[in-house]
């Protein structure tokens, strides 16, 4: 899980999702997981 100020999709399968007011990127590749913070 990477914590970044600006989250961006890295590949085609990355999805930007908002959960409980937190912007996240979910992907099949676990290295692409990101959270805004």
Curated annotation (Swiss-Prot):
It comes from Endomicrobium trichonymphae. Pfam families: Ribosomal_L36. The gene is rpmJ. InterPro entries: Ribosomal_bL36, Ribosomal_bL36_sp. This is Large ribosomal subunit protein bL36. It comes from the Bacteria. One of its GO terms (molecular function) is structural constituent of ribosome. One of its GO terms (cellular component) is ribonucleoprotein complex. Belongs to the bacterial ribosomal protein bL36 family. One of its GO terms (biological process) is translation. The keyword Ribosomal protein applies. Keywords: Ribonucleoprotein, Ribosomal protein.
């Amino acid at each position: 899980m990477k914590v970044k100020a600006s989250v961006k999709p890295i590949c085609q399968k990355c999805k930007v999702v908002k959960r409980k007011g937190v912007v996240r990127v979910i992907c099949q590749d676990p290295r692409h997981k990101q959270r805004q913070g």
